[in-house]
């Protein structure tokens, strides 16, 4: 910076010459359109300030300038000294290093500028489509072979014997020869023999066995015998099926067929594995493309996991499911929950093309009407899309039982009336469409003669339909032994036994149709076996519809789903084989997309118009891969289907280009796209892949339109040093990151414990992400532990080979050169890390450098997860998005165990001989970074700016989105009730007044939004102007809080100084439960709110959905995929507790005596509280693991304390390796306390059981009126606001509140807590920032006025045997239950889906009425008469003891 003598002179000149400038435009993401910018009031004029007026007029802005000056100097020192940016840039310039990815993007841009077809891009498209076609063809061949196997061979298998073990070798022949031979002998279609066969669902996992070699020998034989034994057991257990008998020759026949299918699946798995093994010889990294091969049997309804049951049911096309649900009083609470769970199971099996309707019946019947979809609600039928199913589930959860018995006849009458109306309107066709009628009931009849009336109603309803439908009945019971009459009645309904009741059906019965064709199935849903019976019944109930006329006769490629067991994203290819079942294979989505996921572009470059790729489902236009999507590897739940029209904002894409993509086999088209204020030309190249998918590569021009006015020179030397030319060879001291493997060499590296990582200080480690390999999928899924060591040794030998004789082990061609260049840069970082004179040696956790190709080197060397990708981390993305600046991330949790950390990063540009680099022109090829503790920046503030230590002065640092990096609260301990430290603490969380006022500065910050279509949300966030040149202060004058904000030049950080004696007044509404915005109908620039999200309301199946979501596309850009903040480390065989601590990582915290010295030191925390929240008389510096967040022995986000950390927590002044007898003694004490506590619990439990008849608990909410709890039945009497049919009262919640009253402040409970606000209590609507302090006395006053809810068994009898009432003043009167509580500050109340249906259906309960005035029984309300002036009333709690009551009462 300038010398002090010249500083004042320069500022004087600026004060004279400066003039007010116009509001500057905030540089936003380039994909934002002008419609996304929130306009400000035209009459509003922000405060215009010149640098001179800032310096001389406002003293607070002088403090901001001082803070900015200090931080700029420290960041400059970090960039040059700690990150060694200048030196590393010299290395890249001397070696003329450039990235192949960047070169390809340049070629695309230059080609498109001249409107010439890009030959390189077309070659890539051809190559990618061929690879994808081969993978899908291989899968389709397997599926077709399985189909032929079942279609022509099963009916003949029982004639052959498979018990001869000598024939095992003959079955090794190729499957094609066997199929041809059997097909020649039998070309007839399947016969009726399948009726006598009971086939089992069989699933073979194609995952390689990590513990054994690929030789199958005896292991496969044992597997076959095991499968046969399992088949026999399953067949024995399935004796309840009425269609097959296993006590005759059919049992042996079924066993033979099941054994044959199992053998063929094993042989097919062997052949696929052998094929992959042969491919791996030619390609060192070759993936196994199959997850499962399977046969889903129609006999058992695909009794497997949810995903397989969905595949089985999806074979039945265009289904219509009608639910008739009994909600009468015969159902207990448990049975009613069982009914809801069964409907939920069935809904999960339906796909988007299916239809659903629902009718509830008790003494009255009602159709399901969803408010969120009024168009469909008018007809009572809904498509089974994900949005509809979620709303239906919410509706079902809101149902409650009625107080009257069930009128079964009325339920069937309403159901058939609905079917007739839908048939007349053409929405269903019972003659051509599969209809599933399911009646879920207790089956209790008021009179045995009611069964005849029900069958007459059914017969009359069937008569009005074009074709009769099959009815399935489900009895929900607690015990199957006491349902004799109910079982007979429901069995008659399912079988439509009209003959038994002499009902004439000749007038409508189809001619030539057998009675068995209308026979449905009767199921028993028992509470005792709910975990197994519900899933199995939900899929088996579709068995009668598994007919050839309802099934598809082509291959089906299903949308990707996340496997609940493994977490993999799978794509299934299936084929129906009537009448046996479904055959198919599961493929990895990451395998199909490996070329597209690592296509040379990042999300930021895709948004800026550079090349990218996407993959579409040709039948639906839904997207499988796009730069807006995260990697399948980190996807945790199945996303909503996203049409490509939602993501592409090019001109004429939705109206013209999209149709061409889905219709034409191949082609290209060029159109215009507006990115911000720029007009670019975007070209789409596409190719159809076997008719299933459409692969599209996109390139955009317009790089010449960028502003290239400024250049920045980072290398101050005119001459470039000649670094060591031999960066290959054995002298390269570099280790592969797999430190858990013995990598050979002269001496194995010395491993140690670095926080929670296995690390080494001997050398830096090399990590190669999946993008560095030719087959990224093979790298991620072929990591067999036994072969991994050999693979690691081969990679390192190839990288060190200077002769060029060793073969490439599957790496991309440019990786070897990048490793050598990055190694030279790492030597600079390693020497700086080991320098004992370094001023930041105790603060820097680790240093690393990563290339855009996914090569990472770090020191100290650490073990990383194989799924780690440095190019997708937030520090890498932010540095690439802001090249030439030193970028800092918001605090996040370190996977290595260092707690909350901040990453400081800087880009390295491609090498140039003249060493001149421009942030606008040059391409970044690498990012160098280091990690520091989260409090590091606040330590820098205290060291460089003494003014920040004064009272009423706050100094803050926040990054370009408003997340705090430094705040005075970092000096205070974090607890659940005070100073909660979030991983991402935003400015609006901590400084509400500053956030409210700074939103008036249009040239400082914009409130923006983006669309996340995968979870159907609109994300709101803040974007700060990183080109700000002035210092901004208060817009509203006269406020008690004065502030000044300035940009720290050359970075993405902003400095703020607040001078205030009282921070009261302003607040920003933030939800304490989730991220949902409190007002989704309004988004104004000056409305302060925390970063939040709003749901998108819409249905992807409606005809107008495309235009509906396209409207979002025109207004908001798509959100980038979430950054991969935390990726857990892989488990190792080495125990961390047995490893010695790495030098410098432990044992130094006790040497710091003050908080200032302890602040920001890695692995250290200033310990101020014990685990009970009590302050220490003398605080001390301790290890972070033992005093996380300043609380001794508190739990960390990593889990429980291990033995060494627990020892350190109870002995903070003792080193961890010192011996202490606390372990054995403490263990004995804990065991003794547990034994005594258990004995006391047993004694009190028995005592409470004896005196339970005398204990009463009163609750105004539940109105038990003093009944003993042992005699109070929650199922017989309900709350006064419960509806008879479709109400909104939760019995489980009511019972919990009666026994455990919630007396917790909602403002002092973390968002992750299990606390839930009482249903009739006042809601705070998430205004957490309004009460930053402890509970006030006002709340205690209100507590006195509320009824007493006792939940502690240790109360005295005089307390528990009493009724608590209150005399209420007019201002303290409770609201009527029919009117929900409203908040005066909100125009629209954020209610959940369940609560919405509760409010609509709320009616008084017939159990016990409420007074006409709406008052609650047990509450005394003083009367009000007109407007006459009344004297003041006294508010006092009154306790009436039951010992005072008379016998008559």
From Swiss-Prot:
Subcellular location, principal: membrane
Entry's transmembrane regions: 1221-1241
Record: glycosylation sites: 32, 112, 153, 407, 447, 497, 649, 668, 707, 1015, 1025, 1059, 1111
Extracellular side: 24-1220
N-terminal signal peptide: 1-23
Superkingdom per UniProt: Eukaryota
Mode of membrane association: Single-pass type I membrane protein
Keywords: Calcium, Calcium transport, Glycoprotein, Ion transport, Membrane, Repeat, Signal, Transmembrane, Transmembrane helix, Transport
Cytoplasmic compartment segments: 1242-1449
PROSITE patterns, per database record: VWFA
Subcellular location: Membrane
Region: Disordered, residue numbers: 1307-1339, 1352-1416
Biased composition (Polar residues): 1370-1392
GO molecular function terms attached to this record: voltage-gated calcium channel activity
Ranges of residues in domain Cache: 557-639, 889-934
Domain VWFA: 320-541
GO cellular component: a single term: voltage-gated calcium channel complex
InterPro entries: Ca_channel_alpha-2/delta, Sensor-like_sf, VWF_A, vWFA_dom_sf
Biased composition (Low complexity): 1359-1369
Family designation: Belongs to the calcium channel subunit alpha-2/delta family.
Protein name: VWFA and cache domain-containing protein CG16868
């Amino acid at each position: 910076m300038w010398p002090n003598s010249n500083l004042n002179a320069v500022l004087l000149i600026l004060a004279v010459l400066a003039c007010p400038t116009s509001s500057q435009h905030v540089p936003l993401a380039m994909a934002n359109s002008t419609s996304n910018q929130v306009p400000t009031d035209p009459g509003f004029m922000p405060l215009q300030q010149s640098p001179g007026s800032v310096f001389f007029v406002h003293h607070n802005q002088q403090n901001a300038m001082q803070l900015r000056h200090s931080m700029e100097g420290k960041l400059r020192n970090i960039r040059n000294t700690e990150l060694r940016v200048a030196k590393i840039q010299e290395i890249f310039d001397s070696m003329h290093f450039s990235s192949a990815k960047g070169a390809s993007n340049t070629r695309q841009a230059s080609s498109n500028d001249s409107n010439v077809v890009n030959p390189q891009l077309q070659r890539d498209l051809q190559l990618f489509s061929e690879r994808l076609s081969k993978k899908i063809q291989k899968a389709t061949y397997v599926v077709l072979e399985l189909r032929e196997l079942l279609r022509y061979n099963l009916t003949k298998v029982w004639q052959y014997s498979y018990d001869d073990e000598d024939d095992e070798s003959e079955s090794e022949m190729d499957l094609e020869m066997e199929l041809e031979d059997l097909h020649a002998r039998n070309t007839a279609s399947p016969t009726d023999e399948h009726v006598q066969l009971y086939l089992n669902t069989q699933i073979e996992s194609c995952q390689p066995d990590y513990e054994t070699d690929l030789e199958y020998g005896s292991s496969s034989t044992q597997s076959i015998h095991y499968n046969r034994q399992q088949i026999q057991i399953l067949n024995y257990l399935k004796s309840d099926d009425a269609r097959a008998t296993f006590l005759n020759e059919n049992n042996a026949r079924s066993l033979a067929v099941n054994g044959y299918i199992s053998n063929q699946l094993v042989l097919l798995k062997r052949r696929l594995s052998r094929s992959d093994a042969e491919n791996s010889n030619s390609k060192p990294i070759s993936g196994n493309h199959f997850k499962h091969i399977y046969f889903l049997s129609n006999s058992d309804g695909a009794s497997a996991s949810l995903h397989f049951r969905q595949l089985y049911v999806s074979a039945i096309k265009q289904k219509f499911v009608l639910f008739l649900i009994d909600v009468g009083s015969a159902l207990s609470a448990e049975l009613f929950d069982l009914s809801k769970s069964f409907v939920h199971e069935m809904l999960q099996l339906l796909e988007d093309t299916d239809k659903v309707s629902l009718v509830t019946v008790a003494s009255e019947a009602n159709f399901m009407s969803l408010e969120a979809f009024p168009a469909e609600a008018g007809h009572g039928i809904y498509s089974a899309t994900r949005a509809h199913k979620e709303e239906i589930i919410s509706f079902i959860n809101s149902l409650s039982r009625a107080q009257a018995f069930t009128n079964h006849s009325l339920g069937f009458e309403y159901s058939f009336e609905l079917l007739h109306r839908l048939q007349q309107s053409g929405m269903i066709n019972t003659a051509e469409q599969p209809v599933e009628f399911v009646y879920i009931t207790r089956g209790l009849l008021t009179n045995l003669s009611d069964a005849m009336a029900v069958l007459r109603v059914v017969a009359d309803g069937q008569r009005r339909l074009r074709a009769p439908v099959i009815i399935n009945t489900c009895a929900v019971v607690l015990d199957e032994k006491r349902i004799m009459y109910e079982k007979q009645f429901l069995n008659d309904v399912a079988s439509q036994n009209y003959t038994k009741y002499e009902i004439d059906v000749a007038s409508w019965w189809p001619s030539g149709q057998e009675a068995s064709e209308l026979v449905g199935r009767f199921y028993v849903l028992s509470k005792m076996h709910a975990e197994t019976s519900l899933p199995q019944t939900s899929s088996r109930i579709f068995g009668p519809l598994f007919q050839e006329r309802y099934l598809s006769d082509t291959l089906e490629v299903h949308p990707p789903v996340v496997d609940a067991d493994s977490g993999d994203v799978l794509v299934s290819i299936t084929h129906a084989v009537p009448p046996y079942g479904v055959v198919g294979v599961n493929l990895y989505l990451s395998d199909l997309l490996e070329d597209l996921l690592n296509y040379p572009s990042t999300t930021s470059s895709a948004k800026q118009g550079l090349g990218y790729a996407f993959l579409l489902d040709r039948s639906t236009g839904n997207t499988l891969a796009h730069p807006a999507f995260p990697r399948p590897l980190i996807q945790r739940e199945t996303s909503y289907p996203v049409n490509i029209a939602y993501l592409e904002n090019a001109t004429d894409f939705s109206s013209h280009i999209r149709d061409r993509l889905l219709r034409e086999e191949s082609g290209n088209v060029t159109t215009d796209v507006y990115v911000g204020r720029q007009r670019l030309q975007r070209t789409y190249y596409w190719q159809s892949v076997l008719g299933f998918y459409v692969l599209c590569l996109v390139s955009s021009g317009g790089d010449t339109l960028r502003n290239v006015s400024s250049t920045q020179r980072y290398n101050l030397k005119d001459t470039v040093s000649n670094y060591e030319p031999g960066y290959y060879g054995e002298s390269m001291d570099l280790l592969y990151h797999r430190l858990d493997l013995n990598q050979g060499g002269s001496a194995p590296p010395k491993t140690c414990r670095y926080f929670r990582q296995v690390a080494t200080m001997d050398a830096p480690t090399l990590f190669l992400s999946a993008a560095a390999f030719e087959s990224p999928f093979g790298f991620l899924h072929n990591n067999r532990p036994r072969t991994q060591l050999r693979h690691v040794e081969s990679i390192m030998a190839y990288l060190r080979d200077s002769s060029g004789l060793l073969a490439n082990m599957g790496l991309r061609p440019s990786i070897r050169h990048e490793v050598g260049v990055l190694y030279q840069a790492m030597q600079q970082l390693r020497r700086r890390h080991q320098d004992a004179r370094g001023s930041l040696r105790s603060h820097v956790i680790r240093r690393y450098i990563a290339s855009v190709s996914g090569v990472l080197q770090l020191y100290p060397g650490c073990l990383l997860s194989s799924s780690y990708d440095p190019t997708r981390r937030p520090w890498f993305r932010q540095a690439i998005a802001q090249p030439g600046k030193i970028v800092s991330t918001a605090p996040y949790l370190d996977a290595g165990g260092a707690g909350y950390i901040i990453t400081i990063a800087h880009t390295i540009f491609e090498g140039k001989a003249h060493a001149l680099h421009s942030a606008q022109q040059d391409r970044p090829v690498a990012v160098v970074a280091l990690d520091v503790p989260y409090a590091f920046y606040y330590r820098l503030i205290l060291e460089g700016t003494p003014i920040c230590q004064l009272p009423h002065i706050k100094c803050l640092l926040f990054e370009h989105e408003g997340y705090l990096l430094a705040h005075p609260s970092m000096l205070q301990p974090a607890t659940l009730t005070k100073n909660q430290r979030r991983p991402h603490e935003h400015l609006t969380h901590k400084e509400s007044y500053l956030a409210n006022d700074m939103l008036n500065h249009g040239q400082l910050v914009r409130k923006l939004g983006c669309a996340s279509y995968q979870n159907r949300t609109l994300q709101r966030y803040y974007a700060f102007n990183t080109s700000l040149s002035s210092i901004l202060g208060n817009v509203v004058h006269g406020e008690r809080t004065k502030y000044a904000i300035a940009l720290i030049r050359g970075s993405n950080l902003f400095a703020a100084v607040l001078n205030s004696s009282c921070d009261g007044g302003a607040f920003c509404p933030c939800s304490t439960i989730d991220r949902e915005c409190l007002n989704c109908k309004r988004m104004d620039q000056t409305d302060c709110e925390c970063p939040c999200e709003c749901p998108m309301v819409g249905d992807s199946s409606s005809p107008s959905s495309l235009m509906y979501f396209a409207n979002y596309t025109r207004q908001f850009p798509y959100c980038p995929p979430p950054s991969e903040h935390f990726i857990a480390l892989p488990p190792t065989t080495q125990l961390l507790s047995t490893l010695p601590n790495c030098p410098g990582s432990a044992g130094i915290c006790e040497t710091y005596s003050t908080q200032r010295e302890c602040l920001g030191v890695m692995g250290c925390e200033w310990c101020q509280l014990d685990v009970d929240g009590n302050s220490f008389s003398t605080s001390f510096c301790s290890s972070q693991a033992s005093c996380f967040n300043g609380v001794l022995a508190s739990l960390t986000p990593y889990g429980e304390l291990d033995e060494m950390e627990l020892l350190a927590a109870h002995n903070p002044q003792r080193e961890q390796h010192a011996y202490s007898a606390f372990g054995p003694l403490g263990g004995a004490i804990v065991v003794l306390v547990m034994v005594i506590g258990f004995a006391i619990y047993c004694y009190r439990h028995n005592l409470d059981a004896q005196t339970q008849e005398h204990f009463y608990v009163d609750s105004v909410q539940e109105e038990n009126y003093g009944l003993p709890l042992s005699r109070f039945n929650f199922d017989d009497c309900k709350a006064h606001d419960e509806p008879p049919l479709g109400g909104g009262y939760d019995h489980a919640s009511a019972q919990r509140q009666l026994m455990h009253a919630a007396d917790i402040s909602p403002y002092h409970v973390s968002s992750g807590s299990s606390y839930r606000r009482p249903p009739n209590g006042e809601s705070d609507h998430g205004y957490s920032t309004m009460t930053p302090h402890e509970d006030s006395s006002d709340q205690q006053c209100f507590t006195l006025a509320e009824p007493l809810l006792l939940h502690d068994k240790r109360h005295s009898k005089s307390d528990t045997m009493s009724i608590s009432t209150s005399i209420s003043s007019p201002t303290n009167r409770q609201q009527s239950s029919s009117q929900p509580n409203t908040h005066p500050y909100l125009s629209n109340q954020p209610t959940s889906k369940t609560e919405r249906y509760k409010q609509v259906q709320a009616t008084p309960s017939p159990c016990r009425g409420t007074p006409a005035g709406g008052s609650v029984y047990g509450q005394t309300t003083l009367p009000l008469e007109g407007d006459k002036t009344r004297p003041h009333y006294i508010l006092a709690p009154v306790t009436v003891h039951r010992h005072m009551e008379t016998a008559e009462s």
